[in-house]
């Protein structure tokens, strides 16, 4: 036993804890008055300091099962069980003491001790995504005055596509930016195109009834023409057109020829001042029109016609349709000669 305070003993380190253990391998529990005891070092601390290799191997054995079990949280060791030695107080990070324990899934990376753990890193990304999109800047509408609109319309009448120099000159005249003038011309051209399309469509709608109306009268006008020629129409259904302008129609039935003065029953003579019209001209409205033309030069033809075909001979022949047609042709030819001379 050496007393503390002996200088030779302190110099050679005989009072170290390792030397004490070698001298007393039994590990007596009696506290010696050594330098370690005076300085406050315990026996366990001395053992830990003496065997650093054993401490590192023991700590690695306990860390390996903890890393292998990812679904369970590390629990505090029990009082009687062997636990890993406490590390130095300056090496333990503060975040490990306050970090909550969550079961880890496979493939999940463990957070590095140098970075803060928690939703702080993800919150910044979520906040950026959840922010509403910025509203598009909308330009205020330009309100044109009457003078500006008048000048712009005048320029548009001159040219629908003014060049940049004309636009700049007009912009300075109406006190507007050149960009606003350009946009106004674009809108005005679009409006002009819409108006042109509407006008074309309206003209097409108006033309369609006119075409149908213009095609219908010729088809309806064929009925009056066929009526008097065939003798089936009434005597008063004559055309309002001038009859001598059209070609003479061939003779019809016996009723049309009997209406002529020359082919009537005996006792009716031809007047000297009247020329019998063709069958399709037998209508009252056309009688005065023919009389106003003056005395026709066909007077000599009437007596010759009467001399050749007497009334007494003509009346019995009414029963013969062939004779009636022959007389009608000759009569029309005789009447057509004076009008051709005019």
UniProtKB/Swiss-Prot annotation:
InterPro entries: HD, Homeobox_CS, Homeodomain-like_sf, OAR_dom, RAX/RAX2. A motif (OAR) lies at residues 319-332. A motif (Octapeptide motif) lies at residues 33-40. Keywords: Developmental protein, DNA-binding, Homeobox, Nucleus, Transcription, Transcription regulation. Pfam families: Homeodomain (PF00046), OAR (PF03826). Residues 137-196 bind DNA. One of its GO terms (molecular function) is DNA-binding transcription activator activity, RNA polymerase II-specific. SUPFAM superfamilies: Homeodomain-like (SSF46689). Residues 55-67 have a biased composition (Basic and acidic residues). Residues 209-225, 235-244 have a biased composition (Low complexity). GO terms for cellular component: nucleus. Transmembrane segments: none annotated. One of its GO terms (biological process) is camera-type eye development. The keyword DNA-binding applies. A motif (Nuclear localization signal) lies at residues 325-329. It is found in: Nucleus. PROSITE patterns: HOMEOBOX_1, HOMEOBOX_2, OAR. Residues 49-141, 209-295 are annotated as: Disordered. Plays a critical role in eye formation by regulating the initial specification of retinal cells and/or their subsequent proliferation. Binds to the photoreceptor conserved element-I (PCE-1/Ret 1) in the photoreceptor cell-specific arrestin promoter. Belongs to the paired homeobox family. Bicoid subfamily. This is Retinal homeobox protein Rx. The gene is Rax.
């Amino acid at each position: 036993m050496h007393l503390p305070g002996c200088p030779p003993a302190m110099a050679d380190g005989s009072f170290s804890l390792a030397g004490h253990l070698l001298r007393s391998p039994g590990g007596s529990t009696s506290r010696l008055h050594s330098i370690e005891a005076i300085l406050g070092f315990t026996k366990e601390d001395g053992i830990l300091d003496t065997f650093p290799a054993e401490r590192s191997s023991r700590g690695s054995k306990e860390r390996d099962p903890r890393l292998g079990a990812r679904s369970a949280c590390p629990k505090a060791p029990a009082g009687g069980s062997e636990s890993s030695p406490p590390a130095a107080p300056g090496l333990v990070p503060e975040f490990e003491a306050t970090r909550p324990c969550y079961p880890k899934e496979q493939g999940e990376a463990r957070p590095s001790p140098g970075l803060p753990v928690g939703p702080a890193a993800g919150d910044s990304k979520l906040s950026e995504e959840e922010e509403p999109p910025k509203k598009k800047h909308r330009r205020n509408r330009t309100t044109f005055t009457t003078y500006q609109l008048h000048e712009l319309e005048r320029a548009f009448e001159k040219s629908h596509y003014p060049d940049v120099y004309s636009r700049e000159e007009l912009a300075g005249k109406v006190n507007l930016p050149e960009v606003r003038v350009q946009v106004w011309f674009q809108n005005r051209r679009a409006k002009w195109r819409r108006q042109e399309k509407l006008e074309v469509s309206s003209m097409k709608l108006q033309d369609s009834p006119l075409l149908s109306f213009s095609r219908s009268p010729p088809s309806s006008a064929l009925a009056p023409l066929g009526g008097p020629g065939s003798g089936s129409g009434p005597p008063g259904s004559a055309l309002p057109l001038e009859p001598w302008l059209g070609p003479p129609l061939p003779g019809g039935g016996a009723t049309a020829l009997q209406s002529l003065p020359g082919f009537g029953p005996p006792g009716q003579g031809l007047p000297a001042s009247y020329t019998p019209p063709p069958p399709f001209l037998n209508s009252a409205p056309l009688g005065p029109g023919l009389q106003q033309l003056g005395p026709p030069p066909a007077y000599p033809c009437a007596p010759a016609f009467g001399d050749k075909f007497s009334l007494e001979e003509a009346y019995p022949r009414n029963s013969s349709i062939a004779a009636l047609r022959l007389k009608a042709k000759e009569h029309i030819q005789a009447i057509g000669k004076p009008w051709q001379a005019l």
